[in-house]
């Protein structure tokens, strides 16, 4: 939320188990939605999947960590246990396929990961392109996705983490806010 506030955009933080689609639509009336990290699976993340299904064709959406997984699952992807659990670990991310949220970032950058779940790459719906990967045990792990038709993005890593370069994390958030 702090990186968003730094762009001058007002922020409303809502708990996924203490709000409703109706409240979001009729009272909050957001111009964009960020679905943030959390300690559970998309199935346990309150209304996150419902929010994605309701707003994906109406508003830009960015999912971070659990939000990224929720986006994948909302469109039919399968969330699986990661081969390597990453909590507070810095990894090298790729910047692929000219995503708007990675505009101005180098082709490789370091970011912090806190997760034990990932989107199974074999299940990634065809309506998404991969915009970032990392390697775990010489295998690609999806670190970023972008919908082919709507401004819906997910990043498995944490742009807001102290272990992610502040310049890169802020750039991702400001790129999203400027959509």
Segment roles from a protein language model:
Residues 27-104, 110:
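Cysteine-nucleophile active-site neighborhood
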Residues 10-18, 42, 94-95, 111-114, ...:
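Short gly/ser/thr-rich secondary-structure transition/capping motifs
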Residues 1-60, 66, 165-179:
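N-terminal beta1-alpha1 cap of cysteine-dependent amidohydrolase-like domains
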Residues 65, 115, 158:
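Histidine-centered divalent metal-coordination motifs
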Residues 99-150:
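Catalytic beta-strand/loop cores that center a nucleophilic Ser/Cys/Thr
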Residues 135-179:
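A glycine-centered loop/beta-turn motif at secondary-structure junctions
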Residues 10-12, 60, 78, 110, ...:
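Conserved beta-strand segments of alpha/beta enzyme cores
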